[in-house]
Each structure stands twice: as C-alpha cells, then as structure tokens.
Amino acid sequence: MGPLWFCCLPLALLPLLAAVEETLMDSTTATAELGWMVHPPSGWEEVSGYDENMNTIRTYQVCNVFESSQNNWLRTKYIRRRGAHRIHVEMKFSVRDCSSIPNVPGSCKETFNLYYYESDFDSATKTFPNWMENPWMKVDTIAADERFSQVDLGGRVMKINTEVRSFGPVSKNGFYLAFQDYWGCMSLIAVRVFYRKCPRVIQNGADFQETLSGAESTSLVASRGTCINKAEEVDVPIKQHCNGDGEWLVPIGRCMCRPGYESVANGTVCRGCPSGTFKASQGDEGCVHCPINSRTTSEGATNCVCRNGYYRADADPVDMPCTTIPSAPQSVISSVNETSLMLEWTPPRDSGGREDLVYNIICKSCGSGRGACTRCGDNVQFAPRQLGLTEPRIYISDLLAHTQYTFEIQAVNGVTDQSPFSPQFASVNITTNQAAPSAVSIMHQVSRTVDSITLSWSQPDQPNGVILDYELQYYEKNLSELNSTAVKSPTNTVTVQNLKAGTIYVFQVRARTVAGYGRYSGKMYFQTMTEAEYQTSVQEKLPLIIGSSAAGLVFLIAVVVIIIVCNRRGFERADSEYTDKLQHYTSGHMTPGMKIYIDPFTYEDPNEAVREFAKEIDISCVKIEQVIGAGEFGEVCSGHLKLPGKREIFVAIKTLKSGYTEKQRRDFLSEASIMGQFDHPNVIHLEGVVTKSSPVMIITEFMENGSLDSFLRQNDGQFTVIQLVGMLRGIAAGMKYLADMNYVHRDLAARNTLVNSNLVCKVSDFGLSRFLEDDTSDPTYTSALGGKIPIRWTAPEAIQYRKFTSASDVWSYGIVMWEVMSYGERPYWDMTNQDVINAIEQDYRLPPPMDCPNALHQLMLDCWQKDRNHRPKFGQIVNTLDKMIRNPNSLKAMAPLSSGVNLPLLDRTIPDYTSFNTVDEWLDAIKMSQYKESYASAGFTTFDIVSQMTVEDILRVGVTLAGHQKKILNSIQVMRAQMNQIQSVEV
C-alpha cells in the first residue's frame, strides 16, 4: 500500500526545491574550548577528539557506568533563534555497547535525553535553570542505531550515529539545549543547531522570496508570489506554501507573459517579442512571425502594423495577412434597350488578397450637352441593387431618354474604407434611346357637378421628352372598358362633360411624346353629383358668398385704418418691426381655419397676453429640486409639477432673478405668451407660469438630454445616419408648424433645440432674440444694425436689412443640419464673424461634414440659396426628409470633398503634415489636442511612428469616442498618402 500511495501522490504536493538551512550553532567550528556548563562536575567532560574525517574537534564524553546515582547534565551556551519558529538539532555521537563492558551493572544505559529551555536573554547560571526535567522541555530520548565494543576500539573502528530532532514553536529571543545522561557510556561528537526556510524560487511565472518554515512539522505557511517582469496573474492570486521542513508545496495560480512578451529561460523571464514577431494575447505561447505585408516597429509588439498600401479590416484577426484594395473590374460590356441598361464585367485582376470582393455602381447623368455630370436621381432603379453586388452584372432601368450617362463600376473589399484613396473602377459611357413617357402617377378631382367632372394630374416622373398632349379615357364603372370614350388635352387639366348624374366613372390618362404614347395610369374612380347634392351645395354656398363679400369689405376698411394709424405714428417703429406686425394682420386669410400667431407686443398691456395664452399655476404645485443652468433672466432648474387631479410630472423651471425691472419682467413673460400659443410634438410645451408669487416662473416640459449641440458633442459618432435624419425631420416639422402660424423664430440653432430621452428634438427659446441688445457677454451674437444677431446662423438679408422671415429661418435650419451631421461642430469653425459675412457674400458655403450623405448636403445648399424665394419651404423639407427615411439607400452616397454644385465650398481639408514641426501641432490642427499627453506617454512622438498607427493603437492611447477615432484615422491616412507622394518624388 505504501509504494502505491506514493505513486499516486498529487504532483502539486511534491517539493519543488530543497530547503535552505540556516545554522544557529555548530560545535565543530569551535577553535577553542566549547565551555558548556556541566552538572555535576564529575559528569560530562570536554575533550579533544576526531571526526570521521580525522579532523580535530571538541567533544563531550561521559562514562560513569560503575558509579551510583548518575544524572549528568550538559548545557549549551545561549543560542539566538533569529526569527525561526521551529528549531532542528543534528547530533553526532557514539555509544558503548553495555554488554561489551565487563562486570557492568544492570543500570547501564545506551540512550540520552535532549531538552531545551527558552529565554529572552542569556540568563543561565550554574544553578538556573534547575537541573531537572521541569523547567526544561524534553524533546526526545535519543537512542543509538550502532554501538561500539571493545573489539571496535582495538581495531580503531568508529561507529558514529547521526540523529536529527526538531522542536517548536519557539517564541522567545533564544534558548539553551541540554543533554542528560543516565549511566551511559558515550561521546557527543558534534552538535549543529539550525532552522529551515523555503528558498527563493521562480515558479509558474512568479517570484517567491525566501520564507521561514512554520512552527509545526505539518505547518503550511502561505507566501504570495509576485509576477516576474512583463507577466500578469491569471485566474486567482498566485501563491505557494512553505511546509515545516522548508519545502515549497501546493502551488496555486500562475502568471503568464503579457501580450508582446514570450516566456524564456525555463519560464523565469518574459522577453519582448523580437522585431518582426508579435504575440497578441497573454499566455505561454511564444512570439510568431508577422503575417505577410506587415511588420513591427519595435520589440514587444502585440500586433504587426500593415506596410504602406496594405490594410487590415476591423473584423480581421491580428494574425491575418494585411491586404490591399482590389484593382479595377475588367472587360465591361453594356447593352442599352431604350431607357434600360444591362452591364456585365469580369472580376479585377487583383482582388487585393481578400475574398470579400463586392461591386458598387455609381450612376452619373451628363445630360445632352457638355456640362458637368451629376449623380443620378432616386428614380433610377438598380437590380438586384446598386451597392454591394456579389455578381459581376446589373440591370438598370427608368433612365431618361436621349440622355448621356456615365457608369462607374467600383471594386471594393473589406479594406477599401481603410485606404485614403478612392476605389478602383471601370467606367462606361452610354446614351439612352428614344422612349415613351412613363405613366402618370396620380389624378386629382378639382371639381364636379351633376353632369361634369374636372380632373388634373402631375406630369409623368419620366417624360422622356417634350409632352405633346394627354389622352384621357373614361367609362361608366358598371360598363365594359370597350365602351370607353377618349378625350385629348394639351394640358394636365381637363373637364369631362355630358356625364350622367350620380354615376361613378373610371378614368385613366396617358402622356404622348414624339416617341408615342406612354402607359395608361392606374384606374381612378370619380362620381358626379346627384341632383339632391347639387341643390344642397348651392344653398350652402349662399351664406358663404354673402359672408365673403362682407369679409372683403371689413378687410378693406381694416387696411385703410392701419394705413392711417401708421401715418399718424410717423413711422415711429423701424421698418422691420412694422413689417412683422403688419404680417400678423394681413396674412390671416391665407390659411383658412389655421391658427395664427399673435405677437404679445401688439397688446397694450402685455400682461393681458400672459393671462390669455399661459395658464397660471399655484406655487404650491411646484417643487424645485436642483439648478441645472443659468438663463438670460435668472436660473434654470429642474423639478416636479403636481396639479390637482393629475399625475406628477418632471418639468424645467425658468426663474426671474430678484431685483428685476418691470421691463425685464414683461420681457421674461413674453416668452410664455409666445410659447403658450403653440401645441406641436416638436415644439417645447408650456405647462404654465407663476406670476402671483416670487420668484416669477415659466414652467415647461423637461428635456432630459438638454441642448442638441452639447448632446451631439457628448455622443460624437454614436448615431446612425437615419437617427440623425430623424432628429432633423423633427426640427423641420416643428418649424413647419411655426411657419404655418406665421411665426418667425429668428434664432434657430442647435443650441436652441432641446432633446428628450427618446431623441425627439423640440424647437425652443422663443422671442429672446428681440432682447439680445442688452446682452454683451455672448460672442455668438454680434452687433448689426442696432441689434444683436447670431451671424453664423443668420441669412444674409437678415444680417444686412434685419429682414427676418420664414425663409431666413430656412437658412438657419440649413446651418442646424450642418451642426447635426458634424456632431455639434461650430459652423465656420474659427473664422471671425466678419470673415463669415464676407465668405457668404462671395457665395461660399459650408462643405459637407465627414460622412455626410450627398442628398443631405444638397438640401443644406438649397437652404442657403442667396435668393430667399429659391429656398425650400419647411413643408417641402419635411417631405424630402420623409423620402430619405423611407428610402435609406438614398443616404448611402457620400458627399464628395469637391461637390459638383455651382456654389464654391469653404476649404476645411486636412493640411499637409509637413507644415507642422511636432505631433502636438498636428493634433492642434485637427482639433484633437486633448490627446497630446496620451500620444507622448505612448511613444507616438514622430510622424513616422504616427503614420503607422492602427485602430488598436488609437484605442491604446485612450481615444474611445468613435467620431474622434474616425477623425484621427482619416488624418493619418492622408498623412500616409502625403508621405508616399513625397517618397515617389524623391525617387
């Protein structure tokens, strides 16, 4: 059982290295008398003797076997324990065989006893401690394995016994040893006192220092190891146990070399991966050679950077070879059929070393002249799709007739986005043939009588030439189409007469060009009036005719009165203010049934406007919780509102600072008078006001994410394009509502737009732009014509003439679009306000922000038309954004750096890196100065090293925002391209 048990002992319990023994006392090293204390004096005797190697040593012997009452003690000198908890005693001695002594009494013994006595200092005397078992502590009775006889003495044969005993725990500063003899005949040749400790060892990647053994033979003293240089703990804290014999047992846990370092010298050293090799993860595995087309720039690399012109996709593992962009597709074949086209091609000669090759089709319409080509509209259809084609063919339809097109077939793969260069492409030029117009999409009923119906329709989406005329086909619904009648019309409106009363008719229309008729539209059903309906409509119109006449008369009188009043006032008010006020009176007739905004400053008593449009709230219903900001008139707080019978809601509370003037109070509450007239999901909602107690408050719904510009900057790069378009659509819908009410905002900007927890954007800050004349602290607003104007957001006619209209709000909305797509970047960057005015006067416009779809930038440019009459209405903007949301593919085409638009764009390209002396200057130029220290501490201090940075390197220096990562990576890619250009010139 014993041998079998030993074979099955777990390896973890076997000692790793031999114990270290530290000697406290060794009698063999004495060069003079030992001077140990004996009792009685006739007992032990110190003599010179020889060890087994015949070296002279000092020994003690005793042999009083023929004497009576033998109790002989031998006590060592004071021995200091030096921190040891368990003491070991090695004794070498010889014992005479009692049977070999002639006439020996029966009391002869062949053993002796070992004792110890602890003391904090050397306190022993001739009589202390007492020469008896108590106070001494007995260790053991020592017996000899071998005894010598008279024969051995004659032959000079030495039979020396060696015994080791241990005792503990010891706690005092030192101790004495004592040897007791009872009628024995023996010689104590050597005594060595020592303690054991576990040696310093490097095991499992950790360094364990020397550790004293425990106080008991079964003790296990835990010792924490420290990982060797460039290693880290795995799983659990690493430790081993030192047993009572000074042996390491039970190792737990381990350390492994960090990424970039491999284990050498039997696991005692973590060495940095040599140049040309790398190690990506922590572990025992060694460094491996860099994949193809990659290299390392220093020792200890965790990955290999791609060589110039080669890249690694975000999803590629680090041990994958670096690849490059594919070459252009080959052998393009085109087949044109009227206004459709089939394109086929063969794959590129070089796929770049990757298997994820796909194709993108870029369609450009070049018209029939020699003008610049523009991207095709959304009406062109691509089958199976325009982007991400896996097969080398595509069918394109719904092209315009007699039109020249250029199609670029781009070859792209997983690293195309990593390259600073545009994808390689093959292009083909085609001209479409003559084709008939497309079908009319929809018809509208303009009016009807008992015997006639007037219809109108829009032009076909693709007329494919000049529309010569239209043919309208109609028949009674309950009859066959064979009974149809055709009517021709040179315009898109026709009145069909001689119809039956109260009858449903089916109508279809088609357009004609020189190429012939197009397809009929879908069937539309319209019904003539019955006689009863006709009589009823006549009776209903009679009061309307009388009322309209009366209203017209009242309107004329009102205009005359206004003119007289204005003349009497001698044009006391400025032209812009008069125009604004007159607009409120004269535009009401434009949208019947539509609520019209009323300027509170037209009230003789502005407090009356507050009472009319804002609900008074009792102060007891309002609970202010914390200050979240400061406004023009006082603090902005968050809190709760609990109205009787309603649930408690979270609200924002604007307070009027103490010491206000009556004018400040009136101006403060005017915003509530304005806001209280609005009710739209994309316009901030007024809950009410507190005017009958102090402080005066305006209470609105609470918007959790605060102002849009700050929110975007805090979440740079975190949203999809569709999410951003959704935000823009909300702002446009709110502005359409305000424009329909004839309200001009004057200060539309991302800072004046609030965002709630559902990313719903709401227009806010109403009427405050009227009072900015008193605010000299905000550099956003610059003096112009006696007032303060936010130059960067304001239309040129409003800057020059203070002519604010819904069209000038559209200009501001275009700037808001730019702010949203750039994640809150400052419009016109660090240009001065005067430089902005000059640039706009010279027809310069902002370029597309990074990753901005072309369709969105084109909409911005439409908003920035110099002629305000050419700018889109907010309703048109909402419709355009709705189309983009319904057709996300329209947002995939990114705006080029140099747009094909007529307006020149301000240059905000990345400057040449050679114009900078240091990496810090380069970071300043790309507005990433907050990462200077991180770059320096990580060793990225030269342009050569920076140009080789990868996404992993950028993450390692602490750039965690996706937008910042993309901006830095784009700049590095441009830097590489500039370096390659310089190298090619040098060659």
Swiss-Prot record:
<dbReference type="GO" id="GO:0018108">
    <property type="term" value="P:peptidyl-tyrosine phosphorylation"/>
</dbReference>
<feature type="domain" description="SAM">
    <location>
        <begin position="914"/>
        <end position="978"/>
    </location>
</feature>
<keyword id="KW-0217">Developmental protein</keyword>
<comment type="similarity">
    <text>Belongs to the protein kinase superfamily. Tyr protein kinase family. Ephrin receptor subfamily.</text>
</comment>
<dbReference type="GO" id="GO:0030424">
    <property type="term" value="C:axon"/>
</dbReference>
<dbReference type="Pfam" id="PF07714">
    <property type="entry name" value="PK_Tyr_Ser-Thr"/>
</dbReference>
<feature type="topological domain" description="Extracellular">
    <location>
        <begin position="20"/>
        <end position="544"/>
    </location>
</feature>
<feature type="glycosylation site" description="N-linked (GlcNAc...) asparagine">
    <location>
        <position position="429"/>
    </location>
</feature>
<feature type="domain" description="Fibronectin type-III 2">
    <location>
        <begin position="436"/>
        <end position="531"/>
    </location>
</feature>
<dbReference type="GO" id="GO:0007413">
    <property type="term" value="P:axonal fasciculation"/>
</dbReference>
<keyword id="KW-0067">ATP-binding</keyword>
<keyword id="KW-0418">Kinase</keyword>
<dbReference type="InterPro" id="IPR013761">
    <property type="entry name" value="SAM/pointed_sf"/>
</dbReference>
<feature type="site" description="Cleavage; by gamma-secretase/PS1">
    <location>
        <begin position="562"/>
        <end position="563"/>
    </location>
</feature>
<dbReference type="InterPro" id="IPR003961">
    <property type="entry name" value="FN3_dom"/>
</dbReference>
<keyword id="KW-0472">Membrane</keyword>
<keyword id="KW-0812">Transmembrane</keyword>
<keyword id="KW-0675">Receptor</keyword>
<keyword id="KW-0732">Signal</keyword>
<dbReference type="InterPro" id="IPR001090">
    <property type="entry name" value="Ephrin_rcpt_lig-bd_dom"/>
</dbReference>
<dbReference type="Pfam" id="PF14575">
    <property type="entry name" value="EphA2_TM"/>
</dbReference>
<feature type="glycosylation site" description="N-linked (GlcNAc...) asparagine">
    <location>
        <position position="266"/>
    </location>
</feature>
<dbReference type="InterPro" id="IPR009030">
    <property type="entry name" value="Growth_fac_rcpt_cys_sf"/>
</dbReference>
<keyword id="KW-1133">Transmembrane helix</keyword>
<feature type="glycosylation site" description="N-linked (GlcNAc...) asparagine">
    <location>
        <position position="478"/>
    </location>
</feature>
<dbReference type="GO" id="GO:0005886">
    <property type="term" value="C:plasma membrane"/>
</dbReference>
<dbReference type="InterPro" id="IPR013783">
    <property type="entry name" value="Ig-like_fold"/>
</dbReference>
<feature type="domain" description="Protein kinase">
    <location>
        <begin position="622"/>
        <end position="885"/>
    </location>
</feature>
<feature type="short sequence motif" description="PDZ-binding">
    <location>
        <begin position="985"/>
        <end position="987"/>
    </location>
</feature>
<keyword id="KW-0524">Neurogenesis</keyword>
<feature type="cross-link" description="Glycyl lysine isopeptide (Lys-Gly) (interchain with G-Cter in ubiquitin)">
    <location>
        <position position="892"/>
    </location>
</feature>
<feature type="disulfide bond">
    <location>
        <begin position="98"/>
        <end position="108"/>
    </location>
</feature>
<keyword id="KW-0966">Cell projection</keyword>
<feature type="active site" description="Proton acceptor">
    <location>
        <position position="747"/>
    </location>
</feature>
<protein>
    <recommendedName>
        <fullName>Ephrin type-B receptor 2</fullName>
        <ecNumber>2.7.10.1</ecNumber>
    </recommendedName>
</protein>
<keyword id="KW-0677">Repeat</keyword>
<dbReference type="InterPro" id="IPR034238">
    <property type="entry name" value="EphB2_rcpt_lig-bd"/>
</dbReference>
<keyword id="KW-0832">Ubl conjugation</keyword>
<dbReference type="InterPro" id="IPR001660">
    <property type="entry name" value="SAM"/>
</dbReference>
<dbReference type="GO" id="GO:0060997">
    <property type="term" value="P:dendritic spine morphogenesis"/>
</dbReference>
<feature type="topological domain" description="Cytoplasmic">
    <location>
        <begin position="566"/>
        <end position="987"/>
    </location>
</feature>
<comment type="subunit">
    <text>Heterotetramer upon binding of the ligand. The heterotetramer is composed of an ephrin dimer and a receptor dimer. Oligomerization is probably required to induce biological responses.</text>
</comment>
